[in-house]
């Protein structure tokens, strides 16, 4: 591991701030994870898998950083740009606002935002048809349900997650016109992506109302959804990456966005 890599991977914690060691410029690509970290078993981990696949197959190296809070976004992005990383890939829509400001300052750097859109000549925006995949798992949920009630638990209450919810509900109704679809969002702040305890609470609430298949599109919060569904002997549906192995026999299926492929291609 290079000195630059070690320095960057140690940039964690708001009190310490974000600062690079005294190293030379590098041209490796960089990946900045969203809140929740690269081992969230969902969106971020899918991005990490794509980066690792790229490194393994090409023999290349890349820089990475995990954030602890929103305040670190601008510093992390600016430091990578100033030290020559190219391209710089950001996992998650929440990078949009800071990227809109910084991208024009570094016209020779290619930026890639996954799951968001920024209109700039040096920015590649990668988005998915999440409503279509959600439609398919909605059909599967309704077909597997014995109670006639299925559930959806989203992360942050934003239009992106509403598309997951709408696609899921429409798919469920397409398979069973009489199905009841319950829906909850975890919260309105970025913390909603990494709150498995709250995810479990919402899951129990839906189970109490009759849901026997529950789809989680909530990042790390979904880990709590899947665990609680397993404990209650009902089905869950994973998202972003294949989560079936987390609870074999309990996770009905997973809706893959192939964030890993997007990351691999971006590098």
Task: Give the predicted meaning of each segment.
Residues 27-267:
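A residue-level marker of the well-folded mature domains of exported/periplasmic proteins
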Residues 2-14:
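Bacterial N-terminal signal peptides that target proteins for export
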Residues 12-22:
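Bacterial N-terminal signal peptides
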């Amino acid at each position: 591991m290079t000195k630059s890599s070690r320095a960057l991977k140690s940039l964690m914690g708001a009190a310490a701030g974000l600062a690079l060691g005294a190293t030379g410029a590098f041209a490796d690509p960089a990946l900045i994870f969203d809140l929740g970290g690269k081992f969230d078993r969902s969106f971020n981990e899918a991005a990490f898998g794509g980066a690792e696949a790229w490194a393994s197959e090409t023999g290349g190296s890349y820089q990475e950083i995990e954030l602890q809070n929103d305040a670190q976004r601008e510093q992390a992005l600016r430091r990578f740009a100033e030290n020559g990383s190219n391209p710089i890939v950001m996992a998650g829509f929440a990078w949009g606002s800071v990227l809109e400001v910084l991208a024009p300052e570094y016209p020779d750097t290619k930026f890639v935002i996954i799951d968001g859109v920024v209109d700039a000549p040096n920015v590649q925006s990668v988005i998915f048809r999440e409503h279509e995949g959600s439609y398919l798992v909605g059909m599967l949920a309704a077909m597997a349900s014995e109670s006639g009630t299925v559930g959806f638990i989203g992360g942050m209450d934003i239009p992106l997650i509403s598309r997951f919810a709408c696609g899921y509900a429409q798919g469920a109704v397409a398979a069973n016109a009489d199905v009841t679809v319950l829906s909850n969002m975890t919260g309105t702040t970025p913390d909603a992506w990494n709150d498995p305890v709250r995810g479990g609470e919402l899951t129990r609430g839906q189970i109490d109302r009759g849901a026997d298949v529950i789809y989680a599109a909530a990042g790390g919060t979904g880990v709590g959804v899947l665990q609680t569904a397993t404990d209650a002997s009902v089905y869950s549906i994973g998202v972003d990456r294949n989560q079936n192995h987390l609870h074999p026999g309990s996770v009905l299926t997973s809706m893959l966005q192939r964030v890993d492929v997007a990351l691999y291609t971006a590098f």
